[in-house]
């Protein structure tokens, strides 16, 4: 208890130092300005908005850096020819929806677990959650590989062009080794992000994009490797991005207060992690897959509809990054508040992020609707495509308002651990309402691609109503108790202080302490009595528990490898 009290006092002092430092940076003019704004908004709301923006801006930039790697690869392939460009675009799409989306979604479990645990000051448990995430995400690489190695067969099954399918398979096979790197990057990013540390992802992502452009230029223009060169550039860029972020964490000692070394505890509590991870994955993948289905359906309508839908989709991705940044910020703030037992702050964060997200979406929608006749010229000069994009964009602008609301609610659900509700909402919204209605309007009513967006609009309205009602009915006290239960796994680490400070951000200290754990000699875990996987205090019970862990985790590894073997057999036999 004394150790916990000391840690709490230390963190409180650190927060005070950070606030004093922020006030010093702002100066008297900024302080006066803040006081004026408080005439229109309560001080707490204004401060919450500032903290959300401080997290949302770098979160937006970090997501943009990830998005640009694929875009740059497609741009460099523009000169290769139609077949090659189609193959690269198709390969990137397949990798995203069957690989990257899965890893990103699974890593989303950390939005609940790490944010709440960090908010509850159980810092060493954050490192254990990261270890569990590493092991679980690496296991999920195997079924993804099993699917990806059969890309050509799947494309031919859907009557895609044989030459395009073959080149697509080549690209995907070259990319396979990079999938674990992409997964681990997402996990490391979540590890930092949910501690309120986001700028390292922006920096490393920017450097990775420079390398990506350089590799694409050399491999495509200098060496003339074509599709293989583009795939190699993308693969190397994924490794560079992950390695740079890892090295930055080590260099700046961002791990110091949360990493206690590898422990047997990383093999425990997989059930809780996987339940959250699968729900998070479904929230992301269900939406992503729905839009990829729309691309396939647009292709059935003709080349003009396909090109217009592709342009609108690219615009939608870029515009969506703004509410996504706020969604990430809201998830962090809500998780921290609940983990710390501060329900008022969690409720305030939820309300403010909803309002801010809708305001940004409204401004973005108005801008898009105003520029509807101009946007398409960024991508093409074909008058038919430009006219169709101009016709559909106002409907998408309306969709954006509700999509942003769903995104903000999704962030609140992640921070509060209600991911299952989000997964169910997305499933019903897209596959019971949105897609059936959109497809009917596209083909039966002969509205074309605008019919699809009317379906998405109906989906957004239905989801927004449901999720807003759910968010406003959340029992925040109970959610806080659940968060503190998740973070109740105590970690005791005898440490040696070596007086090396841990640095989390340049400039001011963060909410974390700056004491280095030093050389960790041992880790002891005392699980709460409610844990389903708690260890027995007796030596015999501990030995039995270890044997059970070896058996169950070995079976998990065997199942993962088995799926890859099945995939290889299918590839060789087809």
From Swiss-Prot:
Side Extracellular, residues: 73-86, 155-168, 226-230, 292-309, 372-384, 452-453, 571-574
Membrane topology according to the record: Multi-pass membrane protein
A single GO molecular function term of this UniProt record: organic cation transmembrane transporter activity
Catalytic activity entry: thiamine(out) + H(+)(in) = thiamine(in) + H(+)(out); estrone 3-sulfate(in) + H(+)(out) = estrone 3-sulfate(out) + H(+)(in); creatinine(in) + H(+)(out) = creatinine(out) + H(+)(in); agmatine(in) + H(+)(out) = agmatine(out) + H(+)(in)
This protein's GO CC annotations: apical plasma membrane
InterPro entries noted in UniProt: MATE_euk, MATE_fam
Segments for region (Disordered): 500-541
This protein's UniProt keywords: Cell membrane, Membrane, Transmembrane, Transmembrane helix, Transport
Subcellular location per the Swiss-Prot or TrEMBL entry: Cell membrane; Apical cell membrane
GO biological process entries: organic cation transport; xenobiotic detoxification by transmembrane export across the plasma membrane
Family membership noted in the UniProt record: Belongs to the multi antimicrobial extrusion (MATE) (TC 2.A.66.1) family.
Functional summary from the UniProt entry: Multidrug efflux pump that functions as a H(+)/organic cation antiporter. Mediates the secretion of cationic compounds including drugs, toxins and endogenous metabolites. Plays a role physiological role in the excretion of drugs, toxins and endogenous metabolites through the kidney and liver, into urine and bile respectively.
PANTHER family cross-referenced by the UniProt entry: MULTIDRUG RESISTANCE PROTEIN
Name of the featured protein: Multidrug and toxin extrusion protein 1
The organism of origin for this protein: Xenopus tropicalis
Organismal lineage: Eukaryota, Metazoa, Chordata, Craniata, Vertebrata
Gene that encodes the chain: slc47a1
